Every structure is written in C-alpha cells, then in structure tokens.
C-alpha cells in the first residue's frame, strides 16, 4: 500500500526540493526520538532553502503501536509520553503537531463512552502540556473506513468544545471530507477560527487538479473564514513523487481566490 506522501526520504533534501518547487515548507512524519540537525534547519530557513510547517505523529501508532484509548494503561502512558516528546520538538521548531491515528478507534463491541472518556482524559493532559509550550494540537478528521472517532468536522468541534480543549484545533483533509461531509465547503465555514490545518488532494487522492474537486470554491471558503495557516498537499505519489508535487503546487497557485 502506498502512503499518500508526494515526497519521501531525507528530510533536508526534501525541504530543499520542496522550496525549489515553490512550496513554503514541508510537514514531517517522524518518530518522537528523531534527532534534528538544529543548526542546519536554522541555516536553511535563513537562506530560504526550505522549512518545516508541522510535525505529524502517526508513526507513534503505526510503528510503535501506542494509542490514547488502549485497554493497557502502560500503552496509554506511552502514547502520552510520546506525544509530549513531539510537542517538545514542535516547540523548538516553532510549529504545531498533527494528532490522527494515535487517538485510536473504538473496538467492535466496546463501550464507546468508556473509550471516549479515556480519550478526553489523555487529550486534556496533552492540551495543558501543549499550552505550556505554546504549541497547538491539530486533531485530524479521518473517514469512517479508517477509524470510528472524529469522522466529521462537527463531531470533532463538539468534542473540543465539550472538553474545553483550547489548544486543540480541527485539521481537515479534502480526501476525507469528500467521503464524510455533506458539504465540504460548509464544513470549512463551520470550523471557522477553530480550523487549524488543512490537507489537500483531489477526489481520487491524487494531486490537486487531477480529479473533480472544486478547488476554487475550497480556496474561497478558506479565505472566507480568514484561514491563514498552511495548505499542505497530501496525495498519492502518482504518476511519480516529483510530478505529483510539481503539478499540485502549480495548480494550487492558479486557484487562489478569484484567479482559478
């Protein structure tokens, strides 16, 4: 199975490559133990040869198998500890973190209330820790074929509001929105100022402009709510990584409001 990442491999090479293609920054999928070359990053930023916009925490779940709603208390502790390590890294980089897979999924036949209470407890701890580090947590909204928690913008917003998670924001992705939202553009308006991060791919999950998604309406909706964060391409690397990355940025640049 192919991961939906247009660029992969060495962080610093891809920062440089992305900058050459016209991107402002890259998001970085890594483990919490990754050792950054801080001076190298500082130099690249100064020379405008690449930047990092976000840390993605999925490998804490997919590789280390930690989960915020695990039935094993030690596993939950490991998830929280790992996420705190990501937050520490994000603070040093001056970026935020994405929280997606590590939230887990309620097992079949499980008592949803118990698991959601466990998730609320873990996220409350992380919310407080992130506030102390001036880092925001972007909770990714993922389709129901992949998880059964936070499938829509409304569900995610309600959870954030109910548990007063002031450092947590909604992270939307056009691919998942196309599967879950009755009106993807209205979902953006619904989030408003609580929209913290945004992924784009076309309806087939290939690069923007390759399918049927209306990116002119999308960009206008983002402008309507005053979204000033990153719009990050997360698409399948087809027909190849470099072509997907180039075609995506060229198309999106042409789709600024009133220009598409």
For each feature predicted by the language model, list its residue ranges:
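Generic structural signal for helix capping and beta-alpha/helix-loop junctions
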Residues: 35, 62-63, 107, 140, ...
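N-terminal pre-domain/capping segments
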Residues: 1-91, 165, 249-260
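Active-site beta-loop-alpha junctions enriched in small/polar residues
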Residues: 1-4, 29-31, 57-60, 102-104, ...
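Active-site acidic/histidine proton-transfer and metal-coordination neighborhood
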Residues: 9-10, 69-169
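Conserved beta-strand positions in the central sheet of alpha/beta enzyme cores
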Residues: 27, 54, 98-99, 138, ...
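Catalytic-core regions built around general acid/base machinery
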Residues: 40-49, 119-130, 187-190, 217-221
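Histidine-acidic metal/acid-base catalytic patches
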Residues: 5-19, 96, 124, 150-172, ...
């Amino acid at each position: 199975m192919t991961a939906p990442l247009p660029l992969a491999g060495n962080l610093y090479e891809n920062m440089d490559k992305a900058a050459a293609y016209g991107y402002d920054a890259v998001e970085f999928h890594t483990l919490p133990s990754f050792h950054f070359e801080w001076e190298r990053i500082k130099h690249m930023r100064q020379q405008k040869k690449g930047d990092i916009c976000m840390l993605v925490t999925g490998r804490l779940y997919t590789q280390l198998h930690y989960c915020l709603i695990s039935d094993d208390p030690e596993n939950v502790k490991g998830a929280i500890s790992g996420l705190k390590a990501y937050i520490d890294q994000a603070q040093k980089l001056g970026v935020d973190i994405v929280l997606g897979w590590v939230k887990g999924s309620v097992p079949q036949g499980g008592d949803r209330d118990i698991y959601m209470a466990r998730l609320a407890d873990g996220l409350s701890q992380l919310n407080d820790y992130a506030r102390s580090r001036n880092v925001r947590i972007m909770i990714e909204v993922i389709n129901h074929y992949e998880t059964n928690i936070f499938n829509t913008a409304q569900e995610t917003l309600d959870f954030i509001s109910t548990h007063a998670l002031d450092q947590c924001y909604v992270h939307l992705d056009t691919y998942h929105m196309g599967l879950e939202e009755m009106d993807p553009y209205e979902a953006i308006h619904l989030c408003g100022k609580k929209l913290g991060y945004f992924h784009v791919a076309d309806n087939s999950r290939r690069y923007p402009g390759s399918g049927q998604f209306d990116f002119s309406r999308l960009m206008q909706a983002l402008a309507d709510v005053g979204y000033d964060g990153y719009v990050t391409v997360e698409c399948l690397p087809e027909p190849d990584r470099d072509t997907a990355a180039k075609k995506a940025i060229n198309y999106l640049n042409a789709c600024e409001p009133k220009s598409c």
